[in-house]
Amino acid sequence: MRHRCRVPQLGRPADQRKALLRALTTELIRHGQITTTLTRAKAVRSQADKMITLAKDGSLAARRQAMGYIYDKQLVHRLFDQAQERYSNRNGGYTRVVRTLRRRGDNAEMAIIELV
């Protein structure tokens, strides 16, 4: 039974699921928006919000924690430099998920997740 299961399983083992979410979060921060399935977009939304909250904190411990999650070191530095001015007046809700057309091959629900 799946009582109180908060993370979507995404049809993968735990290590592959964590690696997928790390990769999607890294690419979202790098490009500003990505197109993926709706379930993946909803799963990556919380991780991206956590990384931006760490960047707003700006402490050394928060920077090290973000470096342990985001794959690109220069991207972490860029995120920490921009987050203070970009998200200073916003308390959460740093991403937006917009539904798009279904994927042609398998009719999967697609969405664009973007940084606000």
Swiss-Prot record:
Top-rank taxon: Bacteria
Keyword presence, Ribosomal protein: yes
Keywords, comma-separated and alphabetical: Ribonucleoprotein, Ribosomal protein
Signal peptide annotation: none
A single Gene Ontology CC term: cytosolic large ribosomal subunit
Database matches in Gene3D superfamilies: Ribosomal protein L17
SUPFAM superfamilies the record matches: Prokaryotic ribosomal protein L17
Biological processes per GO annotation: translation
Pfam families: Ribosomal_L17
PROSITE patterns assigned: RIBOSOMAL_L17
GO MF term list: structural constituent of ribosome
Annotated InterPro entries: Ribosomal_bL17, Ribosomal_bL17_CS, Ribosomal_bL17_sf
Family, as annotated: Belongs to the bacterial ribosomal protein bL17 family.
HAMAP family on file: Ribosomal_bL17
Subunit structure: Part of the 50S ribosomal subunit. Contacts protein L32.
Protein name: Large ribosomal subunit protein bL17
